[in-house]
A protein has these predicted regions:
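N-terminal carbohydrate-binding/catalytic regions of secreted carbohydrate-active enzymes
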Residues: 47-133
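Active-site clefts of carbohydrate-active enzymes
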Residues: 181, 185, 235-239, 263-292, ...
Length: 348
């Protein structure tokens, strides 16, 4: 290599370094901040800013945990849907293609309710993440993993059928929920998730997404994002020790970082919320903080054109540790389990 070529390469390297940094007064490089996320109004899902995650399990009800499900009745689900309509929710997120989701879709159609649906497909563990998940104490047996794969294949088929049967209501399909993050108890290998996404996209007209924590998208999300119509992000400042005064700014920071990592992707928040009771972070959990976080998110998302599915509509007592009634997992609802409103929707 000649001296001229070495000089040219050196100058090129300096140029590339400077392109990613700015200089302060003392000529020390300072990393630039991610570009502020600003989307077009057309990037909103169904033109909606604030949407909500919906699951209808009430006191004493629960999904199948190995001993059968105790599901809400159609009358109870209809009551829930009417509450959501009354509070101006026109877009809800469902998490699986099972019986409750079909009932919900049928009730929306039969009662001509002004609600559209992000339909979820739940993926069970196809890989034993006992070394990464804090609450998996032993490996998942191979036979169970094989059975889960069969369940996932069936779930995808049911989800495709629902999306086509209820194409007037289902406006998008979400394949998997936190099945890729390092701490999940229902991990599915990335290649398998991509295969499911491709199968769904080939069979329906609606846009397809996947829901994962923001950190996963930043670190590992490019191959999957390239397959999707938009990227579904989860972000929970309260779980990450942030006080309410930093709730919105931390959420925006997370979204800006995802945007920097995936600049060609449209983004939506598929879960963000604030628990009103939480033994895990009691000093930050309150109705007032939830109301503020909702209002702050609404204000930012309206300007940035980001659809937000607030987590969640109603408290769900079946979740989390049954011996800890104050556990956060039970208390994310905008409404109590008896369907009375919390602070944001309450006329005090």
């Amino acid at each position: 290599m000649t001296a001229t070529m070495r000089l040219a390469l050196a100058l090129t390297s300096v140029t590339l370094v400077l392109a990613g940094c700015r200089y302060s007064a003392d000529d020390k490089p300072v990393a630039t901040q991610p570009t502020e996320l600003q989307q077009a109004a057309a990037d909103l899902l169904q033109g909606q800013v604030m949407a909500v995650a919906y699951s209808g399990f009430r006191e004493g009800q629960h999904p199948d945990r190995g001993d059968g499900a105790n599901n809400p009745t159609p009358e109870q689900i209809l009551e829930d849907l009417n509450i959501l309509v009354e509070h101006d929710f026109g877009l809800i997120r469902l998490y699986d293609a099972g019986e409750n989701s079909r009932t919900t879709l049928e009730l929306i159609r039969e009662n001509d309710l002004p609600i559209k649906v992000l339909q979820g497909l739940w993926l069970n563990a196809e890989f034993s993440n006992h070394e990464g998940c804090p609450w998996l104490n032993e490996p998942i047996p191979e036979a169970e993993l094989a059975a889960n794969t069969e369940k996932n294949v069936a779930e995808v088929a049911k989800g495709i059928a629902l999306a086509n049967e209820f194409s007037d209501i289902i406006v998008s399909v979400n394949v998997g929920n936190e099945a890729l993050v390092s701490w999940t108890d229902h991990m599915v290998p990335l290649d398998n998730v991509i295969a499911y996404v491709r199968e769904v996209k080939a069979a329906i007209e609606q846009p397809v997404t996947v829901a994962e924590n923001y950190e996963w998208w930043i670190a590992e999300g490019k191959p999957l994002a390239a397959e999707l119509d938009y990227v579904g992000v989860h972000t929970y400042p309260a779980w990450e020790d942030k006080p309410i005064d930093e709730g919105l700014s931390y959420t925006i920071e997370n979204m800006n970082r995802v945007h920097a990592a995936l600049p060609d992707s449209t983004l939506a928040i598929l879960e963000a919320g604030w628990a009103t009771t939480a033994s895990e972070f009691a000093d930050r959990a309150s109705e007032a903080n939830q109301a503020r976080y909702y209002e702050d998110l609404d204000g930012w998302a309206s300007k940035a054109n980001v659809t937000v599915f607030f987590f969640e509509a109603f408290d769900e007592p079946w979740k989390g540790n049954p011996d800890n009634p104050a556990g956060a997992e039970k208390h994310w609802g905008l409404f109590f389990v008896d369907r009375t409103p919390k602070a944001y929707f309450r006329d005090d």
